Amino acid sequence: MRLLTIVFSNHCDLDCTYCCVQSKNLSPVNADFKQIKEFIDQYIEDEACIEFYGGEPTLHKDLVKEILDYIDSLDIDVYTRLYTNGMFKDWTDEEIVSVSNRISETLISLDGFTFEESKQRFETEDEFNQVMKNIKTVLTTSTFLGISTVLYGRAKFENMFNNYKLFRSIGVNYFSYEPLTIYNDNKPVVIPKEFFKEFLIQINRIYQDSIENYPDDTYLFVAKELLSSKWFNQGELTQCSKMVRAISPRGNVYMCRDHAANEEELFYSPKVIQFLNKNNFKNDNESFPIIEQNENNLTSCPVKNIQYRDSKMEGSLYWLEDEVQELYIEPLYRAIQALDNKRKDAYNDMLTYSKTVTKYLMKEDANEIFKVSIN
């Protein structure tokens, strides 16, 4: 499935402290429908996924509707996904319902079930309450609604299972998690071992509850920063240069939505960013030669691979050794894939292993966990 991302602008009505978009609200232009239409025409194929991304795409309500109208006019099977902070500024409930019914999947970013847990996202409790109200509105529609949580700080990890249960109680059945990175060239903070241990405990508890209580009605996603290509490499299916295209507000095409969203900072900012300039991540006649040379090497993200290479990282990532991948990460992703694909024949074995891993994690020190095997 080809992934096509439309970045409307880098403007947003929130200011999350951990946002991956730099130079926010500095887009000199907004996305242009003519350029977006040409982008879709060039790259669309049957069963492609078209993402609405930002910034905050719901700030561009009329353009969202115009693009949906154009997609509907195409005689092709397309999956659509909206990434949003859930504010839906200046949208009526009727507009939220109308557009949600036309979108395949809606992924709302939210850190927890309470305002206290989400203070890095919202200035006021009224903003948080508005998002919770909008979630309940979207749940009345046909769109596949997910909650996307960025995990940082001890409480976020410790509350994963409880928040999962609370969101389930209002009808949410799709949960996406993004742990902080394992290596500090990607983001400002490295996930500590004890937090990583807590993440593994909590995600396994969520998996176990899903299998035991909602096997036909739960979908999980964990950001692939933790993957090792030694086992995840699926050839072109996991190669961004082959499968991914993203159009920026300026109309430039990249193979990574983060590049399209951060275009002003990466390619037009007065300051020189040596890493990006020397590796040339822009489209070159439908080719991304630097990316292609570094795909499926060490991790599933070629940009991270280049960062690791430039940092003289070889063979392992920080403390996430091959043994850790084999004991915790690979089984976790295979279990999630089985759950999402409803491969019920695999449930029992994976559930047993998950419970064994959880018991082990809960009784051992974090430093020990990441250097010894489960007997």
Residue ranges and their predicted role:
Residues 36-51, 60-179:
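Radical SAM/AdoMet-radical enzyme domain recognition
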Residues 18, 22-25, 246, 262, ...:
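Secreted/processed peptides and extracellular or luminal domains of membrane proteins
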Residues 28-29, 34, 119-254, 258-264:
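Radical SAM enzyme [4Fe-4S]-AdoMet core and its adjacent flexible, acidic
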Residues 8, 54-55:
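Short acidic donor-binding/metal-coordinating loop in glycosyltransferase active sites
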Residues 1-34:
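Canonical Radical SAM [4Fe-4S] cluster-binding loop centered on the CxxxCxxC motif
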Residues 258-375:
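Flexible mid-to-C-terminal extensions adjoining Fe-S/redox cofactors in radical SAM and related proteins
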Residues 57-58, 255:
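Class I S-adenosyl-L-methionine
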